[in-house]
Every structure is written in C-alpha cells, then in structure tokens.
C-alpha cells in the first residue's frame, strides 16, 4: 500500500517538476532626466530600439527617436504637462503600429489610430507598423489604370493613374483641398458600379495641422455625399503636438497599404506635407539635431521620399493592388523653388500647379495648364479621352501665347482671332463648380464638342449653360457605349457629331430669338 503510494507520489512529483517553469517578466525601465516642448530625455533605456513605443507613468505614449550614449530622446504623443523629472518610463518592446483593415472605413482616427469620432471602438482590424520599407522594383508594375478625379481639367490634361504620386501645389486658398475632396466624391459612382474589390477605390485622407473646424466640415461634406463609407480620415490637427503631426502621414499610409497589399486599390491624400515638415523641423531642433537649409534637418528629403515611395502599383504576382498618393504642398507667394516644394516635386510623378491669379479671375479649378504635368498618367488615360483631348493642350498653349500679344494690338489677322476665340471657349469649358465631379464619359462628350468647334459660335457667357443642357439631352445609350468601348469608334464619332450638330443649332435658335 505504502509502496504504491510512494510510486504514485514520485510520478506526481515528476509531473509537477516537468510542468513547473519560471516565467520571468523583465520590464526595462528608465527615468525622465528632463522634459519640455514635447520632448523627454530619458536615462536607463539602454536596449531600446529606434522608433520603439514607450509608456510614461502618466499613461502617455512616446517614441524613441534619438539614441545617444547617455540618454534617449523621446518625442511625446500627447501632453507633456503630466510628465515630470524622475518619472518612470517603460519600454513596450514594439515599434509604433496602427490598426488597419476594412473596419477603419467610415471612421475618423488620430495619428495613433485611436477613434476620435465618438462611434465606439474599431471592429475587425489588424495592426501594422507605421514605418515599413517601400516595395522593390520587381514587386511593382508600371501605372496603367486610370484614377478618375471627376475634374475635366485634370482628367484631360494631367491624367492620374492608379499607383501614381501626383503633387497638388499652390498658395493658400487656391483650392488645393477642393481638388482632393472632389476626387474622393468622384469615387462614389465608380465604387457603386464596381462589382469586385479590384475595381473599387478606397480613400484615406490625412489632415495635418489643420483646424478642427475644417476637419469637422470635411467629415460633414463626405458623410452627406455618402462618401465616408469608403473613406478613412486621419486627423492630426493644429492643436495636436508636433510628434503626432509628424506621424500622421505614416499612419495613414499604413492604412492605405493594407488595401494595396491585399489586391485592392486605395488613394491617400496628405493635406498638407508642408505642415508635416514644419512639425518635423520643430522636433529635430528640440532633439538638438544639426539644422540645414531653412533650418530643416538634413534628412527632410528622406522624410518625404520614404513616405511617397510607398505609393505603388503592384505586379500581378503580388496581387495587382495599388496605392495612389496625392500629396499637397503650400507655397509662399507662388515660390515653387523653395526647399520643401522642390524636394516633393522631384519625388513625385508630376504636379498640379494652382495659381492665385487664376483663382481670382474665376478659372476654378485654378490649374495652370502650362506648369502642370503628369509624367506617367498618359499611359493610364482612357483611349477615348486621349482621342478627344489630343489637340486640347496644344490649342490652350497657343492661346496663352497669343493672348499675351493680343492685349497690345487691336487689328489681328483671322488665324489669331480664331485661336483667341477657340482658346477662350476651351478655358471656359474646363471650369467646374466645387463638389460636382463629372463622370468620365460626360467629360469626353463635353470636350469633344469643344475641340471639334461646336462651341465656336456660342457666346462665352452661355457656355456653362450650354454644357448643362448638352449633358441633359444626350442619349444615355451613347454614354454607355463610350464606357463599354473605352474608345471612340467611327460609329460613336459620327453619332456624337450628329448629336452635337443638332443640339448646337437648336441651342443657338433658342438663345438668339
């Protein structure tokens, strides 16, 4: 009996001993040496990684940016008022990451992915690092699908493709954000028609250093138009600390990359990167990094290049997804040759240049067609659009050239007079109201009418009215034929010509009587 008990006891002991293990949880902690202006110097975190998230005793998070011999420079993601000298700082062991996934759509979050719209916690999300390496050359494919903005001036003259990076640059109050919002609104119809995820385009809007009222207004516009359901808004407003304004674009990019890497398409708008570079300059100077040109740190180019390189069109082997970037840069008095504007122009695949003078003259969107360019977009442009707007750019360029001389002389020859008349009408037809994007097939019809000379007899003042009436009376079958064919065949061309001819005659008859 005792013998049996002894054997049982020994096996029981053996089991217990094998199952016994000591799991030591080691927390590496440091102490705050000094704190101020959103920067904390911490002593004792010797094994910390660059870009690692830390937690202060008050619950505020921070990120290690400067790793020095004696101490670590940490930028604080929140208010530094609750942090004092001697406070304990804990390593989290993880690099800064944010929630990503389809559960983010329709939400407004801060730079760390925390919801700020009062709609409760996020659902069905995974986490992803904010700083990842951009896809390599082999993983990419050249841009070949169009990304429609719904703006006639952009889709015809500076077309954008899925996976492209197109800079929107201009002074303050020239309509930079309006172009970005119109692009988001234009995806509503495309997403509604899209049957699969490979056709839809999800949007991420990153607001950097903007007023809270501006962001609230944007949310209102998007939700009223039903565009919030396929959009994510990342907001690091003017009242947020500089580290959050610096981080927001990377967080938004990580959210967009989720779609890109899962065979879907996304568009990300950084509004604007000038404010991000100012926030980064502030952080760098406070971290005592040496200043360079315009007091920016030496790696301010890398700040933007590593962000914008993450926008890409993926190859078929890697899922054929894409991330299109529309960075916004604000210039001072139209100075495109300043440090940050030249940097971003050299990184992107083209720019849309907006001018104050054009804006006040009533040409809105105020795009300077001469200085705006799309370096890869023409490969992605619809063949039908390419066919109608081939001569548009040339005629506008000739018009600008002649218009300068026409101010001096009154007796102009017939050819010059023709160029002036045509140019004035083409300029007028490219004007468009805010928040009213036009589907690509309707744009094609309008530009076709303008380029083929049907507007030459119409008074300039009536052109907007002509355009509205034209789009109302066109046969929907003709529009759907353009969409399906993606090409203006001889049959479509003759139908368009007949329609424009008849419509122009009836329009003139009505308005001359």
Swiss-Prot record:
Chain's role: Mitochondrial membrane ATP synthase (F(1)F(0) ATP synthase or Complex V) produces ATP from ADP in the presence of a proton gradient across the membrane which is generated by electron transport complexes of the respiratory chain. F-type ATPases consist of two structural domains, F(1) - containing the extramembraneous catalytic core, and F(0) - containing the membrane proton channel, linked together by a central stalk and a peripheral stalk. During catalysis, ATP synthesis in the catalytic domain of F(1) is coupled via a rotary mechanism of the central stalk subunits to proton translocation.
Single GO MF descriptor: ATP binding
Stated family: Belongs to the ATPase alpha/beta chains family.
Keywords: ATP synthesis, ATP-binding, CF(1), Hydrogen ion transport, Ion transport, Membrane, Mitochondrion, Mitochondrion inner membrane, Nucleotide-binding, Transport
InterPro entries assigned: ATP_synth_asu-like_sf (IPR023366), ATP_synth_asu_C (IPR000793), ATP_synth_asu_C_sf (IPR038376), ATP_synth_F1_a_nt-bd_dom (IPR033732), ATP_synth_F1_asu (IPR005294), ATPase_a/bsu_AS (IPR020003), ATPase_F1/V1/A1_a/bsu_N (IPR004100), ATPase_F1/V1/A1_a/bsu_N_sf (IPR036121)
Subunit and interaction comment: F-type ATPases have 2 components, CF(1) - the catalytic core - and CF(0) - the membrane proton channel. CF(1) has five subunits: alpha(3), beta(3), gamma(1), delta(1), epsilon(1). CF(0) has three main subunits: a, b and c.
Pfam family, one: ATP-synt_ab_C
Site residues (Required for activity), renumbered to this chain: 372
Disulfide cross-links: none
Protein's name in the database: ATP synthase subunit alpha, mitochondrial
Coiled-coil region(s): none
């Amino acid at each position: 009996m005792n013998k049996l008990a002894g054997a049982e006891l020994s096996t029981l002991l053996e089991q217990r001993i094998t199952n016994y293990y000591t799991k030591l949880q080691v927390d590496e902690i440091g102490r705050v040496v000094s704190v101020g202006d959103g920067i904390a110097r911490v002593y004792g975190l010797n094994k910390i990684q660059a870009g690692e998230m830390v937690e202060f005793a008050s619950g505020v998070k921070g990120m290690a940016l400067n790793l020095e011999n004696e101490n670590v420079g940490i930028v604080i993601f929140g208010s530094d008022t609750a942090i004092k000298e001697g406070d304990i700082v804990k390593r989290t062991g993880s690099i800064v990451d944010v929630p990503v996934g389809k559960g983010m759509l329709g939400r407004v979050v801060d730079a760390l992915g925390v919801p700020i719209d009062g709609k409760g916690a996020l659902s069905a999300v995974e986490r992803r690092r904010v700083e990842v390496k951009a896809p390599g050359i082999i993983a990419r494919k050249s841009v070949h699908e169009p990304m429609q903005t719904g703006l006639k001036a952009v889709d015809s003259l500076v077309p954008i493709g899925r996976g492209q990076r197109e800079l929107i640059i201009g002074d303050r109050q020239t309509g930079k954000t309006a172009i970005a919002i119109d692009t988001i609104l234009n995806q509503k119809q495309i997403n509604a028609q899209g049957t699969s995820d490979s056709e839809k385009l999800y949007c991420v809007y990153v607001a950097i250093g903007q007023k809270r009222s501006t962001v609230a207004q944007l949310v209102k516009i998007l939700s009223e138009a039903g565009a919030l359901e396929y959009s994510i808004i990342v907001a690091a407003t003017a009242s947020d600390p500089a580290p959050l304004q610096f981080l927001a674009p990377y967080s938004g990019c990580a959210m967009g990359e989720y779609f890109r890497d899962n065979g879907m398409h996304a568009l990300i708008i950084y509004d604007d990167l000038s404010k991000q570079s100012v926030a980064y300059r502030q952080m760098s100077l406070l971290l005592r990094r040496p200043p360079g040109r315009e007091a920016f740190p030496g790696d301010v180019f890398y700040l933007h290049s590593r962000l914008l390189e993450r926008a890409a069109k993926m190859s078929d082997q890697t899922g054929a997804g894409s991330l299109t970037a529309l960075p916004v840069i604000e210039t001072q008095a139209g100075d495109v040759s300043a440090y940050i504007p030249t940097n971003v122009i050299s990184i992107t695949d083209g720019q849309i240049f907006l001018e104050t003078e054009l804006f006040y003259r009533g040409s809105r969107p105020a795009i300077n067609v001469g200085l705006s360019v799309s370096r890869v977009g023409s490969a992605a442009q619809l063949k039908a659009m390419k066919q109608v707007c081939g001569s548009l750019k040339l005629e506008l360029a000739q018009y600008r050239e002649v218009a300068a001389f026409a101010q001096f002389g009154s007796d102009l020859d017939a050819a010059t007079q023709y160029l002036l008349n045509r140019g004035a009408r083409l300029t007028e037809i490219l004007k468009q109201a805010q928040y009213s994007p036009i589907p690509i097939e309707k744009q094609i019809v309008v530009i076709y009418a303008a380029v083929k000379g049907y507007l030459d007899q119409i008074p300039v003042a009536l052109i907007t009215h002509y355009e509205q009436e034209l789009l109302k009376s066109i046969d929907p079958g003709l529009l759907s034929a353009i969409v399906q064919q993606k090409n203006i065949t001889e049959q479509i061309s003759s139908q368009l010509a007949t329609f424009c001819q008849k419509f122009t005659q009836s329009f003139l008859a009505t308005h001359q009587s």
